[in-house]
Amino acid sequence: PDNVEYIIQVNDNESLVKNINPILPSLNELLHLEALQGLQFFIQQFPKTHTEFIISAHTIGESTKLLMSCKNEERVFTNLLKHLKIDARNFTAYSDKKIYTHGTHYKKFYFTFQNGIFSVAEDIELLKNCIDRLKSRNNLLSNEDFAEIYMMIEKNPNQNWLVVNHKGYFQQAKKIINEGYYPILSTIEKNCS
């Protein structure tokens, strides 16, 4: 979706979890990663061979919400439904796709499977936007600047990557950062352009 603030390309989930846990409280303030553990729950349900995935943060209204997507097989998705004890007939229909819900009254996650891609989000509108974007095939890779960065990421698959969309991220960051830091933030934003 267009409202992306940043993308984390995860090529080694074990390394991500190990390195991010000690600094997660600070990262929550900067990157709004509160839903990361919920997304990790879904990754842990997949066979160990499914280790690459993308987490993206999106501006939804006044807040930031996370979306996670990865390539997968339909049988793995079917097994996920069984493992989570979700009746395959219990879904919300959207644009000829099925959206399933998992969670509690405290936190819910919405997920779907389409064209070999498993996607899960903490916001149903974000997931619907993802479904629409996957159908259109018009995504960030059609942006020349991002495509160039993504080529570099693909050449270095042994590490995890954080790619910040300075146009989206800094607008959201200004809502949570002390005003005294605005000049520094503006300088960083200007240098990113």
Place the predicted regions along the sequence by residue:
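Structural boundary/hinge residues at secondary-structure and domain interfaces
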Residues: 1-101, 146-191
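A conserved glycine-rich beta-strand in the N-terminal activation segment of trypsin-fold
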Residues: 103, 107-177
